[in-house]
Amino acid sequence: MSESSLPEKLRIRAGVRAALFNAPKGFDAMLDPLPAGATVTASPRGDCDVVLGFVESIAAAVSLVPKLKAALGDGGVLWICYPKLTSARSGELSRDVLWKELSKTGLRPAAMVAIDETWSAMRFVPEP
């Protein structure tokens, strides 16, 4: 069985509208090829199916959450992307820290994926 592509891992499927916030240079190229009809924007209108926010501190994560939520359409997928502890960019963020701090914003973690050797992504869903 082949490994899933990055768009598949991030739930970017055919026809999906995705938004990127603070993505590192070259990240959009990592999403190529996109599934048929999928689009990626840095200027969301509040109707996105998938929203990805890149952060390097807990303060940045907490302050970005309202923008991510505002960009997300009903039933959308919200990802917080952060440097792996094993990467050169690592800092204060980890799965456990994000889980604890973002639960205070009404989000709970649902899944994790590896983006590359530097970045991990945690998917969050609204608390019921």
List where the protein language model places each region.
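Short, glycine-rich nucleotide/cofactor-binding loops
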Residues: V51-A61
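N-terminal, charge-rich interaction modules
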Residues: M1-A29
